[in-house]
């Protein structure tokens, strides 16, 4: 089994240092999204006392030329703390902090999608948009081969692995359980986990979260996942289709509702929202993975519990549709719906913002409106359309 060398270090030796008292000092780990739009980075500093609110954590900086975010001649970037969590690795009173990234001129970095998302969420605060995101991922050895799979072959066909139990059906549960507990300790709104259809593939769910909290909590949950995997010497990939062939891909199904959908008669509002989404399918495909639909073109094939990237569809309890209305929601007449199109490596800020823009702000077409100056600008420009994406 291919695991990292660092995972073989004696953790007992490390533990004796972790137990040392640290006085009044507090370690704060700043976490941010790098220039790929997928990776997370972190660095830690010492504060003189435990921060009680996010406002007590100072801004910081980092070398953006080493994170694909700046040139070496003008490399300093700003870290702006926005959400604070408990640190499950160094324990209380130490903290993890989710940060926005600003450039030298204090404008948002290109991959800082939180900045605009927060403004949009504040605009629709009265609608109380709730989200729950189902993060699928695949465990790999450091050689890039799925963890637990035969070195020179494949496991048996899909069927016994989903929510499976037993050493011959699930691989890496120690990672999953450790991540779950670490998220609970941190204050992440994690609400469940399960083994997925492909062996070595897992899912955890975060939510319900209102507004901007969805992106903050999912990104920090991803960071914690990568740190837990680091301790175990394995890798968690969010690739939407890590294995070609007759294997399921990995998505980030997004459950969504507004206050009007969650009360009696809400099904009508759900249906209205789905109709709006159907008219803007191409736009959503472009923002549902970091490569403008290229990644999802490998996953959304109409097979393996996915819809076709070329067509919009919706149905009750239909996991082969773009939008699924849960059976209970259809029966009770209110609740939420599930958008099954976002890829596992999507940016939750982009996904949640797009849902709000289309269903609440009634935006249409491929352009998103800049509500500050009234001018429209297109995030879809330069991105592959879903029809073009199929050729990549």
Curated annotation (Swiss-Prot):
Keywords: ATP-binding, Cytoplasm, Endoplasmic reticulum, Ligase, Magnesium, Manganese, Metal-binding, Microsome, Mitochondrion, Nucleotide-binding. ATP binds at residues 134, 203-208, 255-257, 319, 324. GO terms for cellular component: cytoplasm; cytosol; endoplasmic reticulum; mitochondrion. L-glutamate binds at residues 246-247, 319, 340. Its main location: cytoplasm. ADP binds at residues 336-338. SUPFAM superfamilies: Glutamine synthetase, N-terminal domain, Glutamine synthetase/guanido kinase. It comes from the Eukaryota. SMART domains: Gln-synt_C. GO terms for biological process: glutamine biosynthetic process. PROSITE patterns: GLNA_1, GLNA_ATP, GS_BETA_GRASP, GS_CATALYTIC. It is found in: Cytoplasm, Cytosol; Microsome; Mitochondrion. Mn(2+) 2 binds at residues 136, 196, 203. Its EC number is 6.3.1.2. Its cofactor is Mg(2+); Mn(2+). Residues 26-106 form the GS beta-grasp domain. Residues 113-392 form the GS catalytic domain. Pfam families: Gln-synt_C, Gln-synt_N. Gene3D superfamilies: Glutamine synthetase, N-terminal domain, Glutamine synthetase/guanido kinase, catalytic domain. It catalyses: L-glutamate + NH4(+) + ATP = L-glutamine + ADP + phosphate + H(+). Glutamine synthetase that catalyzes the ATP-dependent conversion of glutamate and ammonia to glutamine. PANTHER family: GLUTAMINE SYNTHETASE. Belongs to the glutamine synthetase family. This is Glutamine synthetase. The lineage of its organism: Eukaryota, Metazoa, Chordata, Craniata, Vertebrata. The gene is glul.
